[in-house]
Curated annotation (Swiss-Prot):
UniProt gene name: OPG162
Topology class, membrane: Single-pass type II membrane protein
UniProt superkingdom: Viruses
Keyword hit for Glycoprotein: yes
Compartments, as annotated in UniProt: Virion membrane; Host Golgi apparatus
Glycosylated residues, chain numbering: N133
Alphabetical list of Pfam families matching this protein: Lectin_C
Function of the protein: Forms a complex with OPG162 and OPG190 to coordinate the incorporation of OPG164 into wrapped enveloped virion (EV) membranes and, subsequently, the production of actin tails. Therefore plays an essential role in efficient cell-to-cell spread of viral particles.
Family, as annotated: Belongs to the orthopoxvirus OPG162 protein family.
Major localisation: virion
Residue ranges crossing the lipid bilayer per the database entry: 15-37
Species this chain originates from: Monkeypox virus
Gene3D superfamilies: Mannose-Binding Protein A, subunit A
Lineage of the species this protein comes from: Viruses, Varidnaviria, Bamfordvirae, Nucleocytoviricota, Pokkesviricetes
Designated name of the protein: Protein OPG162
Length: 168
């Protein structure tokens, strides 16, 4: 192997500094480009586009009016559910969206159900328990209207808001 003289070594050093700088800049720019391209995978947002974030939940106004059965189906397609009647977020949702919307409360044959999962609900824990308990209808669904749960016909069409937890 032939050894290099001092001048050649000096030339390589002089050429190596700009080459190293170019390589460093190239690596940084490539890293930034990769980050921007894969931003959603690397740093997912809590809520998808169109969903509104509030207190570890994402809310979507579907801008559709439909019956309770269709509303539940629509929210399930979005991997979400109707708002529960016992959540403290109902008033906040009303102030954000400013419309009446379905909640997941239904009375069927004197049983109170969460229509998201067909499980029984203890209505004594709800804020307007006395008003709900006085309902004599065998079947009724409920909307949230101006700070209250209001009885309505299940087949009527009302606004649909869907809710889901972050990162689900």
């Amino acid at each position: 192997m032939k050894s290099l003289n001092r001048q050649t070594v000096s030339r390589f050093r002089k050429l190596s500094v700009p080459a190293a700088i170019m390589m460093l800049l190239s690596t940084i720019i490539s890293g930034i480009g990769t980050f921007l391209h894969y931003r959603e995978e690397l740093m997912p947002s809590a809520c998808a586009n169109g969903w509104i974030q509030y207190d570890k939940h994402c809310y979507l106004d579907t801008n559709i009016k439909m019956s309770t059965d269709n509303a539940v189906y629509q929210c399930r397609k979005l991997r979400a559910r109707l708002p529960r009647p016992d959540t403290r977020h109902l008033r906040v949702l009303f102030s954000i969206f400013y419309k009446d919307y379905w909640v997941s409360l239904k009375k069927t044959n004197d049983k109170w159900l969460d229509i998201n999962n067909d499980k029984d609900i203890d209505i004594s824990k709800l804020t307007n328990f006395k008003q709900l308990n006085s309902t004599t209808d065998s079947e009724a669904c409920y909307i949230y209207k101006s700070g209250k749960l209001v009885k309505t016909v299940c087949k009527s069409t009302q606004s649909v808001l869907c809710v889901k937890r972050f990162y689900k």
